[in-house]
Amino acid sequence: MKSILTEYLEICVICGRQSEAEHHLVFGTYGRELSEKDGLKIPICNNCHNMGEVIRKIHGNPMAEKLSKIIGQLAWEKEYALQKADEFGRIINENEKEDSIKKIINTGARESLRKRYGCSFL
């Protein structure tokens, strides 16, 4: 599994137990395949994913589903901004890194996500 959100792929990001599944942060007909390519997945146990109580699982819980999509979008935008900053040599040193990322996100990352996934969650 590839994830741009965590390097700890064997641990459920919600509860800390052993992961048993992958949750695609942008899912549905328009997003699952792209989420796979882009690393917009998190390791998760079955209870936190889709088998536990409604208020403790992602699927079947509209608020949790929406938040997972927002988290996925923010992670994608940051990754996009870092790639663009490297491409254009905009990151000169660590002190300027955060400002550069914010500028790139504000000037294209969100629109690029909208074009890639067909929607935006923010």
Model regions and ranges:
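Extended charged
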Residues: M1-Q18, E36-D38, I42, N46, ...
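Short recognition patches in nucleic-acid-associated and regulatory proteins
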Residues: S19-E33
